[in-house]
Amino acid sequence: MKNKGAKQKLKRKGAASAFGCDLTEYLESSGQDVPYVLKSCAEFIETHGIVDGIYRLSGITSNIQRLRQEFGSDQCPDLTREVYLQDIHCVGSLCKLYFRELPNPLLTYELYEKFTEAVSHRPEEGQLARIQNVILELPPPHYRTLEYLIRHLAHIASFSSKTNMHARNLALVWAPNLLRSKKIEATICNGDAAFLAVRVQQVVIEFILNHADQIFNGGAPGALQQDESRTITKSLTLPALSLPMKLVSLEEAQARSLATNHPARKERRENSLPEIVPPPFHTVLELPDNKRKLSSKSKKWKSIFNLGRSGSDSKSKLSRNGSVFVRGQRLSVEKATIRPAKSMDSLCSVPVEGKENKGNFSRTVTTGGFFIPATKMHASSTGSSCDLSKEGEWGQEGMPAGAEGGCEVGGQIRPLPEQLKVFRPIGDPESEQSAPKLLGMFYTSSDSPGKSVFTSSLFQMEPSPRHQRKALNISEPFAVSVPLRVSAVISTNSTPCRTPPKELQSLSSLEEFSFQGSESGGWPEEEKPLGAESFPGSVTKKAATEDTKPEPEVPGRAECSQSPPLDPGTQVEKKTLHVSLGSQVSKEAEKRPKAEKVMEESQGASQPKPSTPQESLGAGTEPLILHEMDEEDLAQALIWPEIQQELKIIESEEEFSSLPPAAQKTSPIPESSPAPFPFPEAPGSLPSSSAPREVWTRDAANQSIQEAAILTDREKLEPVCSLLESESQQELSPDPASLAPLEMLLFEKVSSPARIEIGGPRNLSPPLTPAPPPPTPLEEEPEVLLSKEGPDREDAARDSRTDVYTEQPTPKESPGIPTPCQREEAIASPNEKQNARHAVPENKGPGLPSPTKEVDIIPQEEGGAPHSAQEPSDCDEDDTVTDPAQHGLEMVEPWEEPQWVTSPLHSPTLKEVQESQTQGSQGHRLERRLCHRPSLRQSHSLDSKTTGNSHWTLEAPFSSSCANLETERNYEPLQPPAARTKIAGLEEKALKAFREFSGLKGLEVLPSQKGPSGIQPKPVETNFMGLAEGKEQEPQLELSNRQMKHSDVPGPDSSKESSPRAQDSTLPGEHPLQLQLKNTECGPSKGKHRPSSLNLDSATPIADLFRLENGAPFSSPGIELSELGDTKVTWMSSSHCKAAPWNSQDTQDLDIVAHTLTGRRNSAPVSVSAVRTSFMVKMCQAKAVPVIPPKIQYTQIPQPLPSQSTGEGGAQPLERSQEEPGSTPEIPQKSTKDDSPSSLGSPEEEQPKQETGASASRRQASITSCMYEGSSCSPEPSASTLASTQDAVVQCRKRTSETEPSGDNLLSSKLERASGGPKAFHRSRPGRPQSLILFPIMDHLPSSPTVIDSKVLLSPIRSPTQTVSPGLLCGELAENTWITPEGVTLRNKMTIPKNGQRLETSTSCFYQPQRRSVILDGRSGRQIE
């Protein structure tokens, strides 16, 4: 079976072999009703083959070949021989091989389209009738054989409790052998097409299996009676396939088929390459379906062979496949329900793992099971929605609650092979049920029956989720476990594989799921109507709910109780991010602007929902459009972005409109769910697709308003367009030009929202105002914005999204990049959530902050993509629950952000931003203007404190904080004068405060955020458009209401309006410093942004984030925010800086990130971060020399200073920390002292501690990284830059580490750090970034600057809260509890002993996400995973 060539040769050699002979000819010549091979194999298997994984597992190749020869030589092999009894799977493999080698498949080529169409018919009854009619068209021999085979398989499925092979799994393994498309075989090399085809084929076969009695009872006689007439049909269906009626040798038959004009044989031959290498689906006896689906395009066949061949033992298969399979098994183990992990795992271990980790989300795994070529359906906006539902339905079959996954839709829509494969649609049970009704697609017919049958009727024996999951696993192509390299390539897919977040959704937010489902795609029925039907009418409703909810949510958010609601949004966003993975990052950027617009519109004409779908569109667009034109992207955006955005919609719409507080709470689960299921996101996206169009319609009304504002903004922004482009480039290194449009849209949208939301920021200024609601509004807003833009605007938005995504996807598509992007996206997701939350408050109040947040989201998204990838992994591992919190991180500010130490992801954005900065101060100013809008982005970014963090995030995304702030400033002028002034004032004050308290304030913000005013950060973010300012203000708002004073958070309008120029002038000074530093860092940052380390950290943080569950797991900045609002912002800056470098090094970094993301389980990335951390710690310690960057800069980048090798790192971090305390006397000091110890560790006390220490260090690392690098470059351009890069990397890593501890800080870290001391911190920090396995692999890659950077980055990730010493990131981990500046050396030492500690940390770090979820389980939680 594996050796197809040999088999084919045997086939040709076997003179009178039934193999490779046309079925009709063979049966006519042999006088048999059904092929003897099938009959004998089926009888044998029914007697002896009721074993685990029958038909899924592959037999021994030699035995298969021997059997084939015996059957071919007219012998009647004795299957009861010991050799075959010992290798029962060889008989099943032979049976599949026979059908795979048929010149014309059992379900003929001619009827392929009819089958797929019949199955896509919506009503099940209609499907049944259609399928029955199509089956009756089969030639009589094919009909009889099909009936025999289907009855046999249905009988085998009845033993699914023993075999773990229910109808879905059997359909998955058999579909490629029975149903093939010439077109697909012609393009057999196309993994995407093959995967999609397998999904469709699986749906068809599953449907037939589930309805075998109805189809063949009534139809069989007719079919048989029609034998004569059918003979005629046969010639039609089987073009002269049966030339000679006599039985000819295989060689002869094949030669004839090739030589003759038999299209089937001929085409099959050509398409599948030589018959020796039959179509990929048929390449492997057992594994063809699953393996094909699971493995990536390039590695598909090999992976398939490995997967199938792994042996009859599913566990061994898991082992063989490596990280993925092992994970799958682990998941299956984790999911008690899916005891059949063996068979399932081998088929889709990765998805299983993530889902199983989720535990309750195992259903999600099932739901994500198949990728139907939703692309078709997606092409039509409405269709895409339907597709999504179906997809969700499909995926949901296995899990009722995992319906939220809209991510798969994205994958389906988009042909991205890896992403598609990885994307797994997850629908909740309701969605599942409603999917068939709501969405007529391939999935629908198969899904509905599959779901029903599989979950309930068909296999009542295995009603438990285990069977469902099992089925899911098998049917999920992305579930395939692949080597690290493959996973790197598939990292994007891998991220989608992180269905766990979606599963988390399904598990945690079942109730909310229904609401989110509609947006998700695989949402419950009520949800679906929400997504599709509700869009026109619901849009307003949702907008209204959004507007109203913001206030209720805000309080919740302040209290962390909002955390669940926010989490849902965040998780949804996460899903979206995952779905988009890389693409969503860019799209998110575009979405954010659109979201801003939506915000605006929401304010004017509540249309958050429309915005969401479009947001989805945008998100999905990026992957679709990797580097395509805007228009193309737009077209694709409709499909793919919608998928992605649908996920977002899930969070926003569901949260707000359907599930005000409860929904939001539920949202977290969906939110986290997406990470692993970016694939699940696809389903959500699908509905989004249709929703966006609907949105356009409803947006039409608001369109005029928004368009007017946007047009004005656009006009203003047009000049900024180039700058935006630069920023975009930095953000998404791939396509600056494409990004520019996105940025433009963003800013345009931002500006109008800014104007509208001017009043809002004030109102939102209260920390809790924005909290929960904003995520929804923001998420919805993007779509609304899109719709409001109208077709033109939408197109532009889409184009920009597409461009951005195109840019980002390029790196993401790169084997490595997809994961980093995903992670960044994940990071962005939390930030987006924040933005959304802020947007909601802004919806309540002004629309300006919302835009800012949206913009912020873009950079974060970039960071979030990699993070998202990582997140999925976490989600997969029982982090889904936490993930929602983290997704709703914005909601649970502290947790979410610290948790998601996706700073590496963010770092890339920051780096890109820095790069943009390098492009020009003017560009920076413009960027800053954009940044103001990006302030929304900020919110979106992981910085839970939306304002401050957003500011930084924006900075990061746009060249540099300087540039960002300046851009914001410049942009503000574009904004209405009032808005501008408000922004300027806010930014100025915030910037100052932020710079001054960047380390401390972040810390204080975090504590405030985390404890007293968890929501405050959001309001702050909402209030500001400026990144730094917002960030700073948020801390001020939260901790000392400084923001209100500075930027009149209550009256941001007046503040910003009053001092737009003042801010410009002030910020320029501050920003220039920052700008320089960031620019400087930009160069080093690229080295720094080593995704590998970051990713590893991110990957670990994913778990941590999930662990935080309350906190923001999305991005390390977000996590930092959790720990310290401002610190996270700093993280974002650093992260973004790295993110830009990431993008520059996207392939490399993304590769690493991909490894990390796909292989958080792979551990290699983690270890890399750990090793790098130690290495960087050593280097940084040696290099650490006190260099004092501008105070402002220092405030913003306290930690990076230590990180800097130039020595400014060590001294400056102290200075910065001190400065920060000075600036923020109360909180900053507290932050500096306490942040590192227990920023996240203790809710309020420890959090302040850690926030101060960790935040200060983080911020210092981040700021030092970004700003300080500039400084560093000045004194020691090359050494400094190198050191800076490394430091920045270390900072990033610290952030990641911090993110890791962030999760701990929130829960375990609180306890551990409070009492654990440096060791606990070390475990926490190094642990997350470093996995035991990962550590050894990548740990010792410090030789290259990139590696060093990675190490540095890993180090920050490791000690996210204690980013005090960038250079001592590891040391910071060790020291994590105290002294940001001094701790550098100590921390370095602690980190240096990575070997012993690594093991410790690796388990704890690996299981950190759980730690986030469970305080006590912080260290062990990850291990549990």
Curated annotation (Swiss-Prot):
- State where composition is biased (Pro residues): 671-681, 767-777
Known post-translational modifications? Answer: Phosphorylated on Thr-776 by GSK3; which reduces GAP activity.
Which Gene3D superfamilies does the entry mention?
Rho GTPase activation protein
Phosphoserine carried by residues: 272, 343, 346, 384, 464, 685, 690, 765, 961, 1092-1093, 1163
Which N-terminal residues, if any, form the signal peptide?
none
**Where is the protein situated, by its record's location annotation?**
Cell projection, Lamellipodium; Cell junction, Focal adhesion
Cite the SMART domains for this sequence.
RhoGAP (SM00324)
Q: What region holds the Rho-GAP domain?
A: 21-216
Keyword Lipid metabolism (UniProt)? no
Q: Where is the composition biased (Polar residues)?
A: 603-615, 936-951, 1196-1206, 1250-1260, 1299-1308
Keyword annotations of the record:
Cell junction, Cell projection, GTPase activation, Phosphoprotein
Q: Where is the composition biased (Low complexity)?
A: 511-522
Which Gene Ontology terms of cellular component type are present? focal adhesion; lamellipodium
Q: Which PROSITE patterns match?
A: RHOGAP
GO terms (molecular function) for this protein are:
GTPase activator activity; SH3 domain binding
Please indicate which residues carry the site annotation Arginine finger: 56
A Gene Ontology biological process in which this protein takes part is: small GTPase-mediated signal transduction
Q: Where is the composition biased (Basic and acidic residues)?
A: 543-556, 587-600, 789-804
CDD domains linked: RhoGAP_CdGAP
Tissues in which the UniProt entry reports expression: Expressed at highest levels in heart and lung.
**What does induction of this protein depend on?**
By serum (at protein level).
InterPro entries attached to this UniProt entry: PX-Rho_GAP (IPR051576), Rho_GTPase_activation_prot (IPR008936), RhoGAP_dom (IPR000198)
Role summary: Functions as a GTPase-activating protein (GAP) for RAC1 and CDC42. Required for cell spreading, polarized lamellipodia formation and cell migration.
Please give the name of this protein: Rho GTPase-activating protein 31
